[in-house]
């Protein structure tokens, strides 16, 4: 009953979305469908549920603007590589990832026990060489797909049920129905994440901002912006595509 009510609320709260940005939604859906197999190959390497991962970044696909992204990629290349995040910190790529977001994520990953088992390590030093390598990864869609996998692994670890010793300490993200995992993971992705340690992240903190409508999308004629709940859009997409 609770899940049915949640899905009904998602539908009611975002029905206007596909009507006002119908073409962008359809274009994003086609793009996701055509890239799904390639994304799945990446996400499965890191034991990340590919349906959840795709839904988490779907709203960014709806908003994506090629020409704006090209300009921002150029700005990040010329500003971030030599000067760090103070030089430039634009979100880039289809998944709209900021260098500062990725720097924090890499550091959290390298503090975890997952880097060695998955054979994935990062140079987190404050050097131009490390920033160049990071930019190269961010400029690649496969690189961004790997970062999303890393993000979700860390999110499910820090906001999961188990502490570092494997003791159950809370009802974590892993215990929720998939559509709710999507809603909360997407909200955290959009709002920013406070990295903790295993089992210590507060889902209530994420829930507190889930309903906030701060994600801007243009209307059909791109004459003005309307603001949406990022988590609700992601959950709606999941319900449409994967939870039929």
Give the location of each predicted region.
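Non-catalytic cell-wall polysaccharide-engagement segments
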Residues: 12-15, 37, 44, 104-244
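Export/targeting segments at the very N-terminus of extracytoplasmic proteins
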Residues: 13-90, 142, 146, 159-176
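Bacterial N-terminal signal peptides
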Residues: 2-8
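Generic structural microfeature
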Residues: 7, 51, 92, 143, ...
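Alpha-helical transition-metal enzyme core signature, strongest for iron centers
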Residues: 60-64, 101, 189-193
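Electropositive, surface-exposed helix/loop patches at the edges of structured domains
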Residues: 87-96, 100-104
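Structural recognition of the beta-strand scaffold that forms the well-ordered cores
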Residues: 55, 93-96, 188
């Amino acid at each position: 009953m609770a899940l049915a009510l949640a899905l009904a609320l998602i539908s009611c709260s975002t029905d206007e979305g596909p009507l006002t940005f119908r073409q962008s939604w359809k274009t994003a859906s086609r793009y996701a469908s055509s890239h799904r197999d390639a994304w799945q190959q990446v996400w499965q390497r890191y034991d990340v549920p590919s349906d959840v991962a795709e839904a988490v970044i779907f709203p960014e696909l709806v908003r994506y603007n090629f020409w704006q992204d090209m300009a921002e990629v150029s700005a990040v290349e010329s500003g971030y590589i030599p000067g760090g995040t103070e030089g430039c910190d634009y979100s880039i790529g289809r998944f709209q990832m900021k260098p500062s977001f990725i720097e924090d994520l890499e550091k959290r990953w390298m503090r975890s026990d997952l880097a060695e088992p998955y054979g994935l390590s990062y140079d987190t030093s404050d050097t131009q060489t490390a920033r160049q390598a990071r930019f190269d990864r961010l400029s690649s869609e496969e690189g961004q797909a790997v970062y999303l996998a890393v993000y979700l692994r860390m999110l499910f670890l820090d906001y999961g049920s188990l502490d570092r010793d494997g003791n159950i300490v809370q009802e974590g993200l892993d215990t929720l129905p998939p559509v709710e995992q999507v809603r909360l993971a997407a909200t955290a992705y959009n709002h920013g994440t406070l990295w903790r340690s295993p089992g210590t992240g507060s889902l209530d903190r994420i829930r507190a901002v889930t309903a906030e409508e701060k994600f801007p999308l243009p209307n059909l004629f791109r004459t003005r912006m309307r603001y949406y709940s990022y988590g609700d859009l992601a959950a709606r997409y999941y319900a449409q595509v994967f939870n039929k």
